């Protein structure tokens, strides 16, 4: 948390615990960072520990250690097959992934997320049609709207107890999604988070939490199983 505070102060903000809005701000282009350098893979980084812009011809990429933020639209494509990215490793220093960062990366199959990731922005991985199952870190607090929309090959999702919010339609149209597990009590769920997940069979929730989950996700009440 101390390193995160220092990063925020470097961006001109002073905060105790960053909010969802703070993380969105970190990832935005409101602060037009000066490009500090381009790495050997052709990826641009700022002088404020942000990955600014990626090379869409890369097939595999490891985000550099020390990076705090993957900026909005960093690897986003304007057409589904414009990106060649197949696998992605997010350094454990990264705390936030911005809006549309990897959206429509149609060949992307494998991602390893930072163990310290807190925020995933809206549409971050939407339309990554070939993305396979992956693990969310125990640090994660915010998953933005449509963040994994139309990730057709996901079959199982396990959400950490740290999670505070899932935005609307975050996992909508994940056609092969069958099993979801919540390790803790999710305070807020947007509308339609599993909309059009026609193969969803069961949502595992903690014992004693059924009333809460029916309240925040009433349309899925027949799928809840306490354990």
Q: Where are the model-predicted features located?
A:
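Short regulatory "switch" loops immediately downstream of catalytic or recognition motifs
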Residues: 75-79
């Amino acid at each position: 948390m101390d390193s995160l505070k220092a990063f925020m102060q470097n961006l001109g903000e002073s905060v105790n615990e960053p909010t969802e809005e703070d993380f969105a701000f970190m990832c935005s282009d409101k602060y037009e960072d000066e490009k500090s350098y381009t790495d050997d893979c052709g990826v641009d980084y700022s002088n404020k520990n942000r990955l600014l812009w990626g090379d869409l011809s890369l097939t595999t990429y490891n985000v550099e250690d020390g990076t705090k933020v993957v900026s909005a639209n960093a690897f986003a494509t304007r057409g589904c097959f414009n990106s060649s990215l197949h696998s992605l490793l997010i350094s454990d220093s990264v705390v936030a992934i911005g809006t549309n960062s990897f959206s429509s990366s149609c060949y992307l199959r494998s991602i390893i997320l930072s163990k310290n990731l807190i925020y995933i922005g809206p549409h971050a991985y939407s339309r990554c049609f070939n993305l396979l199952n992956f693990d969310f870190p125990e640090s994660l607090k915010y998953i933005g709207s449509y963040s994994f929309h139309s990730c057709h090959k996901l079959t199982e999702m396990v959400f950490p107890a740290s999670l505070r919010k899932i935005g609307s339609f975050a996992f909508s149209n994940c056609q092969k999604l069958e099993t979801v597990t919540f390790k803790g009590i999710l305070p807020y769920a947007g509308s339609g988070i599993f909309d059009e997940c026609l193969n969803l069979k069961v949502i595992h929730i903690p014992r004693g939490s059924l009333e809460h989950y029916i309240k925040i996700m009433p349309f899925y009440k027949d799928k809840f199983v306490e354990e």
